[in-house]
Structure formats: C-alpha cells, structure tokens
Amino acid sequence: MTLIEAQEGQEYTIQQIQTNDEELNSFLFSLGCYSGEKITVVSRKKSNCVISIKEARYSIDSQLAQAIVV
C-alpha cells in the first residue's frame, strides 16, 4: 500500500519508492525516505500529508505520498 492508504499514527517500514522521476527520488532520499526506513503518517490535510521520519516531520503532497510504498 502507499502512504495515501496508510493509517494516521501507525509506524510503517518503507518497502520501496515507486517513481521514474529521478529528481523526485533524489528529493525523497534527501529526507531520509528510502527502503527499510521507518515512517509514520502524523496527519492528513486535504492534499498534503505530514510524515515523521527519523524524528523529523515533513509536509509532503499527495504525489510524493503516492510514490512511497509501505
């Protein structure tokens, strides 16, 4: 499932990043978002998700959330 389908407050392990866009993949990697890393959806607001990775919080749009498979 992708982060769009993930439940708020539950910790997941990232299985893969599904994108052919190298810039998007590089951006997610710079956030610490890569296979094997733990991730939590903190909250959702319309088209954005607030996620927690490595004790840091980020707001990402639905396109980024759709690329993250947990």
Segment roles from a protein language model:
Residues 19:
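Short, conserved catalytic or interaction motifs in soluble domains
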Residues 23-27:
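Short alpha-helix capping/helix-loop boundary micro-motifs
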Residues 2-5, 66:
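Intrinsically disordered, low-complexity, charged/polar segments
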Residues 14-16, 30-32, 50-52:
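Short, acidic/hydrophobic/Gly-rich beta-strand patch recurrent on exposed beta strands
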Residues 14, 39-41:
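Conserved hydrophobic positions within beta-strands
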Residues 41-70:
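C-terminal structural segments of small proteins and small subunits
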